[in-house]
């Protein structure tokens, strides 16, 4: 029996004092005791120690896989070595080269390199020693073309042309007017408002005064009191209006002039049966509920008038218009209704004129979403341009010599701006999609050759957003991005004749 017991112990670990089962049992009891002391539990559903061990093993395994992958990639595509990439950059200096045949040509910019190679590749970084082994050519490319491309073409396109009038500017002078182009949705907080209803801004351009409301401008004569009084304007408000830039003037569609409506054949006899008076007679019809209704007698019927237009006609004292004629509703209902006069320029109520001293910024806002047939055109007024206060430092001042207000002084790109655009007509209902343009973050615009070859080379394969020409043309224009223009060699480059000094802070 003793010999049999000694034989069983001999099959265990160490000196044969214990078996494998006894060792694993002891280890289990040790782990259970440790859990009882640390977690006050002995059921052993979860063993934190084993989880930690597995986590360490998994981390080490992942690190080994990553290292092996990096080693394999270094053999496939060694860093700093010449390969078949057509666009190459010096890893030390950043100089850009394009490979044509067996020769390297210094490229002026990334746009030129892509157009020459016909591929939207990014530069492959190479050591200077490797570049030195290749034959060289002269400088190639388009001077001034962009070097970065991150196309953005959101479905909703929004553009603004803004005038900001300095409160110290003299009447009629453009020196104190700053023109801003905004690409993106405006910020309408901080007392900024969209002009609607009777809201209006009165500005001057040249020798004329203009009432700006409902997305368009209408000329008004500062001496025509018959029109000014019903509109709630004074001759001083109109004659002393602040100036408007040519950029905003061109962007705003022109509406009918605000003057006394011209009635054809005023004073002559009306030809329809039951006419209450001669042509040009203003008639008023009392209503049981609501305001009185005004109408105007024309040659072949009567046209409904807004009360404000009826007052203008009364103030003018034209023929047949000395005093409103009262007509019963039953009589008016028998008269033919016509619509001969365009009265869309006149508001329903007196104007609520924006004080330009408190709201010196006036913006024309064009907005259109993909799939819509018409653009929305509105006017925004506020104390500053519609840019969030935290974004004001991102407004880019442009370098230009023009002081006539025909070009932008500064530009801002919102978070949802479009930089690859197609020009469309200025009319809100325009359906055309014309030339293609690339807009840089510095505010310059570059024409893009409308060919699949050029667009593929530049990486501009997405559908361009629409942009109105009246806003886009205010940005400084760069050269056209085409392959023919890129395939040009240079010894030297022309000098910019209108530069601006860079002020370096001390």
Swiss-Prot record:
Coiled coil: none annotated. It comes from the Bacteria. GO terms for molecular function: ATP binding; hydrolase activity. It is an enzyme of class 3 (hydrolase). One of its GO terms (cellular component) is peptidoglycan-based cell wall. Pfam families: T7SS_ESX1_EccB. Disulfide bonds join 162-363. It is found in: Cell inner membrane. The keyword Cytoplasm does not apply. Residues 1-55 are cytoplasmic. Its EC number is 3.6.-.-. Residues 77-506 are periplasmic. InterPro entries: T7SS_EccB, T7SS_EccB_R1, T7SS_EccB_R3. It is a single-pass membrane protein. Belongs to the EccB family. An ATPase (shown for residues 80-506). Part of the ESX-5 specialized secretion system, which is responsible for the secretion of EsxN and a number of PE_PGRS and PPE proteins, including PPE41. Part of the eccB5-eccC5 operon, which is essential for in vitro growth. This is ESX-5 secretion system ATPase EccB5.
